Amino acid sequence: MLPMITEFINYGQQTIRAARYIGQGFMITLSHANRLPVTIQYPYEKLITSERFRGRIHFEFDKCIACEVCVRVCPIDLPVVDWKLETDIRKKRLLNYSIDFGICIFCGNCVEYCPTNCLSMTEEYELSTYDRHELNYNQIALGRLPMSVINDYTIRTISNLPQIKNE
């Protein structure tokens, strides 16, 4: 008779513990009910990226000194830097610079360690293509500004500014 009573007490304790766990889970579920949804309707709504978002790399050809620091700090040796030594001025002349975004892990080391700041991360994240070879960007494609910057009305070129007349 005594083992039957202890089994009944254990069963009751397990039932109370299970009900408490179910209640805790239910309270967590209810606490999420008053939050706004995180889901966005992608083609029609765009994500607002954070200030330090690491998207596509922007490259400024004129600033690059072909030092290859970006290649040395890259964990996968990704940037391809082609240069030619100008013997008369004893400096390197950059011929070609390319990055394959199909392989890039967007770690940002190349941007952080570049001595001339010719590399920067943009907020552009839409890099999908049907052919993986289209993800290999040369210096011309890397030099293009992202669409969010091009369409931003607050950024104007000097040619678009109103002319000031000096009279």
Curated annotation (Swiss-Prot):
<keyword id="KW-0411">Iron-sulfur</keyword>
<comment type="similarity">
    <text>Belongs to the complex I 23 kDa subunit family.</text>
</comment>
<dbReference type="GO" id="GO:0005506">
    <property type="term" value="F:iron ion binding"/>
</dbReference>
<dbReference type="InterPro" id="IPR017900">
    <property type="entry name" value="4Fe4S_Fe_S_CS"/>
</dbReference>
<feature type="binding site">
    <location>
        <position position="104"/>
    </location>
    <ligand>
        <name>[4Fe-4S] cluster 2</name>
    </ligand>
</feature>
<dbReference type="GO" id="GO:0051539">
    <property type="term" value="F:4 iron, 4 sulfur cluster binding"/>
</dbReference>
<feature type="binding site">
    <location>
        <position position="64"/>
    </location>
    <ligand>
        <name>[4Fe-4S] cluster 1</name>
    </ligand>
</feature>
<feature type="domain" description="4Fe-4S ferredoxin-type 2">
    <location>
        <begin position="95"/>
        <end position="124"/>
    </location>
</feature>
<keyword id="KW-0408">Iron</keyword>
<protein>
    <recommendedName>
        <fullName>NAD(P)H-quinone oxidoreductase subunit I, chloroplastic</fullName>
        <ecNumber>7.1.1.-</ecNumber>
    </recommendedName>
</protein>
<comment type="subunit">
    <text>NDH is composed of at least 16 different subunits, 5 of which are encoded in the nucleus.</text>
</comment>
<keyword id="KW-0677">Repeat</keyword>
<keyword id="KW-0472">Membrane</keyword>
<dbReference type="Pfam" id="PF00037">
    <property type="entry name" value="Fer4"/>
</dbReference>
<feature type="domain" description="4Fe-4S ferredoxin-type 1">
    <location>
        <begin position="55"/>
        <end position="84"/>
    </location>
</feature>
<keyword id="KW-0934">Plastid</keyword>
<keyword id="KW-0150">Chloroplast</keyword>
<comment type="function">
    <text>NDH shuttles electrons from NAD(P)H:plastoquinone, via FMN and iron-sulfur (Fe-S) centers, to quinones in the photosynthetic chain and possibly in a chloroplast respiratory chain. The immediate electron acceptor for the enzyme in this species is believed to be plastoquinone. Couples the redox reaction to proton translocation, and thus conserves the redox energy in a proton gradient.</text>
</comment>
<dbReference type="GO" id="GO:0019684">
    <property type="term" value="P:photosynthesis, light reaction"/>
</dbReference>
<feature type="binding site">
    <location>
        <position position="67"/>
    </location>
    <ligand>
        <name>[4Fe-4S] cluster 1</name>
    </ligand>
</feature>
<keyword id="KW-0004">4Fe-4S</keyword>
<dbReference type="InterPro" id="IPR004497">
    <property type="entry name" value="NDHI"/>
</dbReference>
<keyword id="KW-0520">NAD</keyword>
<feature type="binding site">
    <location>
        <position position="114"/>
    </location>
    <ligand>
        <name>[4Fe-4S] cluster 1</name>
    </ligand>
</feature>
<feature type="binding site">
    <location>
        <position position="107"/>
    </location>
    <ligand>
        <name>[4Fe-4S] cluster 2</name>
    </ligand>
</feature>
<keyword id="KW-0793">Thylakoid</keyword>
<keyword id="KW-1278">Translocase</keyword>
<dbReference type="GO" id="GO:0048038">
    <property type="term" value="F:quinone binding"/>
</dbReference>
<dbReference type="GO" id="GO:0009535">
    <property type="term" value="C:chloroplast thylakoid membrane"/>
</dbReference>
<keyword id="KW-0618">Plastoquinone</keyword>
<keyword id="KW-0479">Metal-binding</keyword>
<dbReference type="GO" id="GO:0008137">
    <property type="term" value="F:NADH dehydrogenase (ubiquinone) activity"/>
</dbReference>
<feature type="binding site">
    <location>
        <position position="70"/>
    </location>
    <ligand>
        <name>[4Fe-4S] cluster 1</name>
    </ligand>
</feature>
<feature type="binding site">
    <location>
        <position position="74"/>
    </location>
    <ligand>
        <name>[4Fe-4S] cluster 2</name>
    </ligand>
</feature>
<keyword id="KW-0874">Quinone</keyword>
<dbReference type="InterPro" id="IPR010226">
    <property type="entry name" value="NADH_quinone_OxRdtase_chainI"/>
</dbReference>
<feature type="binding site">
    <location>
        <position position="110"/>
    </location>
    <ligand>
        <name>[4Fe-4S] cluster 2</name>
    </ligand>
</feature>
<dbReference type="InterPro" id="IPR017896">
    <property type="entry name" value="4Fe4S_Fe-S-bd"/>
</dbReference>
<keyword id="KW-0521">NADP</keyword>
